[in-house]
Amino acid sequence: MKLIIVSGRSGSGKSTALHVLEDMGYYCIDNLPIGLLSPLTQEVLDQGKTQNQQLAVSIDARNLYRDLSDFPSIYAALQAHNIDVEIIYLDANDATLIKRFHATRRKHPLSSKSTSLKEAIAKEKQLLEPIATLANLYIDTSDLSIYQLRDQVKIRVIGHKTQELALLFQSFGFKHGVPSDSDMVFDVRCLPNPYWDTALRGYKGTDQEIIEFLKQHPEPEQMLQHIISFLETWIPHFQNSNRTYMTISIGCTGGQHRSVYICERLGEHFKKKYDNVQVRHKELAQ
């Protein structure tokens, strides 16, 4: 049987991820106590379900600390019974989680009169560490919309299931920080910058005006071909090491022009070679 465990801090998008899995045909259980994980899977096996049975559960920090600490041994026991276990761990930066709780006016499950929201979020990270360290898939949802998160979960789960590589090319601005989910980072700040042309400053890297500007210079094409050559050489090696997804980040100063252009070109190229290719522009989504 196939078991997907969805975990992560409150407000990171676990419910959304579980809904995606339900739409994909998984039988889903929300907020399962860790102590019931082994009995549940055993019950499914005892009922004579087929090996194609797909089960997904979410686990959060409301479990007892002792149970969370025991998770690695429970995980190992499930694998010993030939259960195909996959862990999806969702997270976001503290500022984003705080903003989401303020927006929804929900109470954090670990907050109390003596524990502030900020303290509860920090405590939750510590409690979930035994699960986070074993995660097969880590998704940072800080800058993702609900729809982008749904796409991320779907493409990564499908890729993991079929052993088909899923590629995400994302542009970003270094002044906003390097995305924490990056597997590779390419710095394109050395390329000619249309920002300094006041007539072009308001355009984005997907606009024809910026495309034409960058095509007028030899450096962007040269940089692009070098990145393509590097990726075509090394992506197969990552595939051979059982990687089923990769996040390749392209950064310029503000994430508006050069990185967007290069990212789009990379997406166009690799969509001809791989079925699961996504392009995302982190700063344009703001």
Curated annotation (Swiss-Prot):
Q: Annotated Gene Ontology MF terms?
A: ATP binding; GTP binding
InterPro entries per the UniProt record, alphabetical: P-loop_NTPase, RapZ-like, RapZ-like_N, RapZ_C
Q: Indicate which residues the UniProt annotation says bind ATP.
A: G8, R9, S10, G11, S12, G13, K14, S15
Keywords, in A-Z order: ATP-binding, GTP-binding, Nucleotide-binding
Listed binding positions for GTP are D60, A61, R62, N63
What's this protein's family per the entry?
Belongs to the RapZ-like family.
Say what the protein does: Displays ATPase and GTPase activities.
Q: Which NCBIfam families match?
A: PRK05416.1
Q: What is this protein called?
A: Nucleotide-binding protein HCH_05324
Organism expressing this protein natively:
Hahella chejuensis (strain KCTC 2396)
